[in-house]
Amino acid sequence: MLENIFHLKENHTDVKTEIMAGITTFMTMAYILAVNPNILSASGMDSEAVLIATALASFVGTALMALLANYPFALAPGMGLNAYFSYTVVLTMGYSWQLALMAVFVEGVIFIALSLTNVREGIFNAIPMTLKSAVSVGIGLFVAFVGLQNAKLIVNSDSTLVTYQHFKGATFHSVGVGAILALLGVVITAILLVKKVKGGILYGILITWLLGIVCELTGIYVPDVDAGMYSVIPTAFVSFDFSALGETFGQVFKTDFSGVGLLNFFAVMFSFLFVDLFDTLGTLIGVASKADMLDEDGRLPNIKGALMADSIGTCVGAVLGTSTTTTFVESASGVTEGGRTGLTAMTTGVLFLLATIFSPLFLTIPSFATAPALIIVGFYMMGSAIKIDFNDPSEGIPAFLTILAMPTAYSISEGIAIGIISWTIINVITGKAKEKKISPLMYVLTVLFILKYVFL
């Protein structure tokens, strides 16, 4: 049966290898179960509900990837997009999280249509390999920057925008100790990875969390709710009570549009559409590139199935109560362990489903314990930099601008926009358009991005 569904022999793999690869993928990306509630709760959403929604959305999206595309890629609510949801749409723009969920749902429906009409596939294939590699690197820096913020290793500064945390003062036993533990977590995780310990990222989270528990029990770490530093000692381990999901499930259809206006809603929806389109393509590019699954022309075979899984997963996630569901770069860890088919993804998906009963445990994991995972994931993404020809300025400069823009603009989509505009203009003006065989779609995207900056 499994052979008929996943074509194991054709892909030179077996059931044992695929299952072990799926477990490895889960171990390297399980941190999202702790990180996503931390980020989305900033928008006012119930953290326990978000955790359950995250696990269920991850299961649905990953299972669809297995069945529709037969790829060993796992999906979950994406980093970057969840930050955009909370910190930009809700906290900065002032909209409710229910309206933000509706925007995610609507753009998911639109993406289903775009996937059926090959628009998303066309955009994926039109982006040059140099920019695809740069996107992977830029996402890595962006995710690492988010990790530094979550650990409070980087804080706001009136003079320099951001600065490193000062470990002295009244908040030392809360914020300061948390930042120090995050640094230790990075070192511990790095050692585990150097020693090739499977699931080293997850073990790094658990060890850092354990150190936090020891520090709290000994009085070194003192919770400070006002500073966003909570108790790290769990009061429960398992729960079969999923009633918390009611706080977010279906709320997308109870959006209050009063005082928002149709134009304002479409502005929010378009923002999600724009960010999700290029964040998703960027992440998929990064994962496929890291896993060496792109063909010699930079195309991903059977990409339509992967995009459909992504689109449907986003709609389901919005109904459950979480931000956009997308492919995770950590899927490459399962590929490294030999995963080659959807059986790897299905294994990961089932593990996410089982994780729902451990929600009390995951909710206690502090942000300083998950931050090292984000920083290390950033390191993994940097590997694509070696594929960029920095000796050729027409290739290297647009790639550099793409990489630079993502963490500095706090936006993956802005990095892609800057990269596409600069790559097209530089190569056209220098007479390299014919040599580079620039796709007509690249010209269209360049014009659209320029219009976006002029009018939006």
List where the protein language model places each region.
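Helix-loop-helix junctions within the multi-pass membrane cores of secondary transporters/permeases
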Residues: 2-36, 57, 78-87, 91-139, ...
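Helix-loop-helix hairpins and the membrane-proximal interhelical loops
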Residues: 1-49, 165-168, 205, 209-303, ...
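Residue-level signature of catalytic and energy-coupling elements of molecular machines
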Residues: 19, 39, 123, 199, ...
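Loop-to-helix transition at the N-terminal end of transmembrane alpha-helices
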Residues: 44-63
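Membrane-embedded alpha-helical modules
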Residues: 93-210, 346-456
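Hydrophobic/aromatic residues within the transmembrane alpha-helices of Major Facilitator Superfamily
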Residues: 23-30, 63, 67, 144, ...
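Juxtamembrane transmembrane-helix boundary signature
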Residues: 58-79, 110
